[in-house]
Amino acid sequence: MSIDYSDMAFPKPARKKKKKHHKATILKSRKGICYLCARLNGDYRTKVTEEHHILFGSGRRERSEEAGLKVDLCIPHHRTGQQAAHNCREMRELLCRIAQREYEQTHTHEEWMALAGKNYL
């Protein structure tokens, strides 16, 4: 017993998901070089890096992407170390201060407040 599938509307044609094209980072961050290692220690060696969204959580990650508020961080500075951006409030706020300074060079303070909801300067 075989079924003729030729006149059935299946499988449905796959719909491609549209990719969002986000701005490049507004901070001077290069792929493979940890932003914090370079800024704090002068270490410009190539490392395994992960993209860190400076504003994250409750829909702010997408807005962070659109505004270019992201940097490449090595794994210890991103999630595992004592001074990791996800573990250390001082490091997270340092990144937010730097990002706010850069953002406000081309935008107003009111635009930053609408985006981030907090003043870090």
Which ranges hold each PLM region?
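A boundary/linker detector
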Residues: 1-48, 93-121
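Short glycine-/acidic-enriched loop or helix-start segments at secondary-structure transitions
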Residues: 45-46, 61, 86
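Residue-level detector of alpha-helix boundaries and kinks
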Residues: 19-22, 58-59, 88
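Short linker/helix segments within small regulatory modules
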Residues: 55-70
